[in-house]
Amino acid sequence: MPKMKTSRAAAKRFKVTGTGKLKRNKAYKRHILTKKTTKTKRNLRKATMTDETNVKNMKKILPYM
């Protein structure tokens, strides 16, 4: 059986934690920031875990992570 290919786009966007969960950065922090509150922008800085409903698909496109 041939090797599975890792999705390079996904590999650059996700990291695996020590417990095996997928960590990701939040969206909506690139532009049009003037209308967003300071609190919103501060909360967007923090990384978060990938939702459990998406983990199965993410593991499929990231076979070696």
From Swiss-Prot:
GO terms for cellular component: cytosolic large ribosomal subunit. One of its GO terms (molecular function) is structural constituent of ribosome. It holds the Pfam family Ribosomal_L35p. PROSITE patterns: RIBOSOMAL_L35. Disulfide bonds: none annotated. Keywords: Ribonucleoprotein, Ribosomal protein. GO terms for biological process: translation. PANTHER family: 54S RIBOSOMAL PROTEIN BL35M, LARGE RIBOSOMAL SUBUNIT PROTEIN BL35M. Belongs to the bacterial ribosomal protein bL35 family. This is Large ribosomal subunit protein bL35.
